[in-house]
A protein has these predicted regions:
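Conserved RNA-binding domains used in RNP assembly and mRNA/RNA metabolism
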Residues: 1-94
């Protein structure tokens, strides 16, 4: 598992989460598991604290689960978050 910033193809939405490959997933089935996904919000003003830019991913508000699965073909790219974003995420999720 690794904490990554995920950029989705469809709307360039950025989600930071602990990402793990689902081994043995059938073709077309969700093959990426996200743990504690948070959306990185783009704000008009620079916030004093980057935690203000991270909000729980709205999809997760409909469940008590802390994990969800997505199809990797919905992902445009996976990148390593900047240290200050990673630190804010860790502070919110621990």
């Amino acid at each position: 598992m690794a904490i990554k910033l995920i950029v989705f193809k469809e709307d360039y939405r950025c989600i930071i989460a602990d990402v793990d490959e689902v081994v043995g997933a059938d073709l077309g089935e969700p093959d990426c598991e996200l743990t504690k996904p948070y959306e990185f919000k783009v704000l008009d003003e620079e916030p004093a604290d980057y935690k203000d830019r991270l909000v729980p991913w709205a999809v997760m508000n409909m469940s008590s689960d802390k994990k969800c699965r997505i199809q990797s073909d919905n992902i445009l790219t996976l990148i390593n978050p900047e240290k200050f974003i990673l630190d804010a995420y860790k502070e919110l999720t621990t």
